[in-house]
């Protein structure tokens, strides 16, 4: 018997068009305009409203019901549109709270993001008595084992530590119904691809897979064929991905050492609200932090080599507004939510164009306004033009009155 295929919005492509591929949302995806009409459990609805959500965002209106139905889902949504809550609500709805075993596994590319997902799950599931553990590198293994032995409904973590816990048999996978890959473009990029496959091999064959990210390059979608079954696609066109409300500028600097002077000139502008400055390497972050402090500027900094405790206290300070300027590597660029950030400076242009949107997506969340300033050396002009073309956007030279735009 022939299996009926799910209708999809058609895409007619010649071979040479493959680089410009744009999926549409699958035709059978309907829009559910309110949380009340999603068929969610009462104690979860209470948690959603207590958390401050009133109306679901565009991605939530489309994806939550599909995930709850048990479909594999590829969801693409801009940074700051509520995609974390999309899968958190879906995961919580699917739990059997009576069974104290791990039923959902969420993988994220950074420790901070995994920690934030855990916080959102616990907040939304506040009235459900949900147990949720964040399983991340750089923390005490014994504590992980103790928490997992106690029983956790949901585990959010980084692939390396999660796989370690599965191998030690501390994280039992037999009851897992759902695997969520957050920031999937980063996760499936070289570094995490093998680790995800390692984890996936231990999951029950019928595990539902949800993949969520702001950018989904074609080669990532190719990989999803390996472990997703007839996935529903909820995608925005790539050209809409540069975030509205974010003004993007560049400052031409002839030499690397001039970047520092330019940054010092901009410091007063930085502290109007809060700012994040991105460098491409940990060494550059340390160097720039030290140089700024020597010049009597107050800055904090964060990168992946710092001990977990230190990273957490730096994030806490920054979230509370106690520190105003944070210098970081791309460890910060993925999904971290600090609403007051309205200025991003790319001290170094990112190494790939997907990262650009993750960085500038930090500012102007949920439609707030934001400004991104790119420091561009002569040999960076080509990369900048490539970013402009890729996102169909315009990056103008920075005006003198940039402070008025923040």
UniProtKB/Swiss-Prot annotation:
All residue ranges annotated as the Helicase C-terminal domain in the record: 245-406
Occurrences of domain Helicase ATP-binding (ranges): 64-234
Coiled-coil zones: none
Superkingdom of source: Eukaryota
Enzyme class: hydrolase
Protein location: Nucleus; Nucleus speckle; Cytoplasm
Pfam families assigned: DEAD, Helicase_C
Motif (Q motif): 33-61
CDD domains recorded: DEADc_EIF4AIII_DDX48, SF2_C_DEAD
Residues spanned by motif DEAD box: 182-185
Keyword flag Nucleotide-binding: yes
Assigned EC number: 3.6.4.13
Claim: Kinase is one of the keywords in the record: no
GO MF terms, alphabetically ordered: ATP binding; ATP hydrolysis activity; RNA binding; RNA helicase activity
Biological-process GO terms, alphabetical: mRNA splicing, via spliceosome; mRNA transport; nuclear-transcribed mRNA catabolic process, nonsense-mediated decay; regulation of alternative mRNA splicing, via spliceosome; regulation of translation
Residues where ATP binds: 55, 60, 77-85, 337, 362-366
Annotated PANTHER family: ATP-DEPENDENT RNA HELICASE DBP3
Subunit (UniProt): Identified in the spliceosome C complex. Part of the mRNA splicing-dependent exon junction complex (EJC) complex; the core complex contains casc3, eif4a3, magoh and rbm8a.
Role according to the record: ATP-dependent RNA helicase. Involved in pre-mRNA splicing as component of the spliceosome. Core component of the splicing-dependent multiprotein exon junction complex (EJC) deposited at splice junctions on mRNAs. The EJC is a dynamic structure consisting of core proteins and several peripheral nuclear and cytoplasmic associated factors that join the complex only transiently either during EJC assembly or during subsequent mRNA metabolism.
UniProt similarity note: Belongs to the DEAD box helicase family. eIF4A subfamily.
The protein's name: Eukaryotic initiation factor 4A-III
Organism, as annotated: Salmo salar (Atlantic salmon)
